Amino acid sequence: MAKGSKRVVRKRAEKKNIANGIAHIQATFNNTIVTITDIAGNVISWSTCGTMNFKGSRKSTPFAAQIAAEDAAKKAMEHGLRSVEVRVKGPGSGRESALRALSSAGLNISVIKDVTPIPHNGCRPPKRRRV
């Protein structure tokens, strides 16, 4: 008996129809990660400087953060996103440029929050670099 060939049927990514969301910008010294979620925290789209083909020290530039934020915003706007609440975390150089890129991509920014974690004298920080 011949076996019938089984064809794998993949589900297409559904287009969610979401008007409001949250844009999380994590700006570290080496990279910038932009994640756009709905109000509940489910990820709609994301982008990083590394996925936009910036490698090494070029990932930490404001221009790379701008390109990554524009990419994440375009992906999210395909799902119907119009306005976002922005939460910025970290001390990196891509904070402001990623924020500007989100607004210039066509998203309406309602609130900007800085959610950088600040220790109340917790862990010992890394030692100073001697270059």
From Swiss-Prot:
PROSITE patterns: RIBOSOMAL_S11. One of its GO terms (biological process) is translation. Keywords: Ribonucleoprotein, Ribosomal protein, RNA-binding, rRNA-binding. It holds the Pfam family Ribosomal_S11. Located on the platform of the 30S subunit, it bridges several disparate RNA helices of the 16S rRNA. Forms part of the Shine-Dalgarno cleft in the 70S ribosome. HAMAP family: Ribosomal_uS11 (MF_01310). This is Small ribosomal subunit protein uS11. The lineage of its organism: Bacteria, Pseudomonadati, Thermodesulfobacteriota, Desulfuromonadia, Desulfuromonadales.
